[in-house]
Regions:
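Hard-cation-handling environments
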Residues: 242-243, 268-269
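Membrane-embedded translocation segments of transport machinery
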Residues: 232-238, 247, 261-266
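Membrane-embedded hairpin module used as a gating/binding unit in multi-pass transport
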Residues: 203, 207-213
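C-terminal motif of bacterial Sec signal peptides marking the signal peptidase cleavage site
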Residues: 15-18
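Sec-dependent N-terminal signal peptides
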Residues: 6-11
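N-terminal catalytic scaffold of extracellular/periplasmic and nuclease hydrolases
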Residues: 21-169, 173-195, 199-200, 217-224, ...
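Positively charged n-region of N-terminal signal peptides that target proteins for export
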Residues: 1-5
Length: 269
C-alpha cells in the first residue's frame, strides 16, 4: 500500500493525543471527548484493568486551561475553537476570535500542507466541536450556515449525522447535491459507507445509528425533524434485517470502531 501523509480529526466519545518519536510526523489522529477529563479516564482505566488505550502518561500527558475569553467555564463552541485553532474566544463563538474574525484551524493548516483530512463524529456533523475545524459563526445555533460552510471544508471523508440542515433548509438548497457536484459521493446509510471504494465521500446517517443515547425502536419519534424521521424509517424498514445478518452496523456501540476504520482505510489509499 502506498503511504501517504494523513491528517484525521476524529471527534468522538474518547480523548487521546498520540505523539511520535519519529523526526517526521506522517499521521495525526486527534480525538476529542465530551466530558472526558482525568476523573472519567481514570475511572475507566481502573474498571477495565488498564486495557483501554488511555494509559496515563504513555508516552506523555499534558494539561490546559479551559476558560474561555469571557467566562471561567467554557462551552462547546469556545472549547472546540480553542482545540481546533489554539485561540481563546467568547462562549458561544465558534471558529472565530472574540471580535468575530474567522480563525484558521489545524485541519486547514494540514490541508495546505498537502495532507488528507477526515472528520468522524458520533453526533451531527455541524455540532460545535467538529464545526470548529471548518466553520465560523457567532452562535452554535447557526446550523444552516455551518452546513453550507461544511461544503467548502475541503475534508476528504466525513461520517456523522444531521441530515436535516443539509436538505431541509430555509433557502431550499439541497446541500447534498452541492457536495455531489463538488466531487463527493454522499451516502445516507451504513451499507453504502461500509462498501464504498470512493476516495472522497460524506456519510450522513440517522442519529440513532451513531449514538446510543438517541437510539429508538420507534422510527416516528426522537429525530430532529421530519426529514430524519422519514430517512430513519425507510432505512430501518429496508436494511436492518439484512445488515444484521451480514455483519453490518446494527448498534451505535459499533459505530466509532467501524467509522474510524473506514476513514483511515480511505485516507491511506
Amino acid at each position: 500500500m502506498k503511504k501517504q501523509t494523513i491528517f484525521l480529526a476524529f471527534l468522538a466519545l474518547a480523548a487521546l493525543v498520540s505523539c511520535s518519536k519519529e523526526p517526521k510526523v506522517e499521521n495525526v489522529i486527534y480525538l476529542i471527548g465530551d466530558g472526558m477529563g482525568l476523573g472519567s479516564i481514570s475511572s475507566l482505566v481502573l474498571s477495565e484493568d488498564g486495557a483501554t488505550g488511555f494509559e496515563m502518561g504513555d508516552p506523555v500527558i499534558g494539561f490546559s486551561e479551559t476558560c474561555s475569553a469571557n467566562n471561567y467555564v467554557t462551552d462547546s463552541p469556545a472549547g472546540g475553537t480553542a482545540l481546533a485553532t489554539g485561540t481563546r474566544t467568547k462562549n458561544g463563538y465558534l471558529g472565530v476570535d472574540p471580535d468575530g474574525n474567522q480563525l484558521k484551524s489545524i485541519m486547514k493548516d494540514a490541508q495546505e500542507m498537502g495532507m488528507k483530512s477526515a472528520i468522524v463524529v458520533n453526533t451531527v456533523l455541524t455540532e460545535a466541536t467538529p464545526a470548529s475545524f471548518y466553520g465560523g459563526v457567532l452562535s452554535r445555533s447557526q446550523g444552516y450556515d455551518l452546513a453550507k460552510q461544511f461544503t467548502t471544508s475541503g475534508v476528504d471523508v466525513a461520517i456523522g449525522s444531521g441530515l436535516s440542515v443539509f436538505i431541509n433548509r430555509p433557502d431550499s438548497v439541497d446541500l447534498t447535491e452541492t457536495l455531489i457536484n463538488d466531487g463527493y459521493d454522499v451516502y445516507l446509510d451504513w451499507r453504502s459507507v461500509v462498501n464504498t471504494t470512493s476516495d472522497k465521500f460524506v456519510g450522513i446517517l440517522p442519529m440513532g445509528d451513531v449514538h446510543r443515547r438517541n437510539k429508538s425502536t420507534n422510527t416516528t419519534a426522537g429525530a430532529a425533524d421530519g426529514a430524519e424521521v422519514c430517512l430513519a424509517a425507510k432505512l430501518a424498514a429496508s436494511a436492518q434485517e439484512e445488515n444484521i445478518k451480514e455483519g453490518y452496523l446494527s448498534e451505535p456501540d459499533q459505530y466509532l470502531c467501524k467509522a474510524t476504520a473506514k476513514a483511515i482505510e480511505t485516507l491511506e489509499r
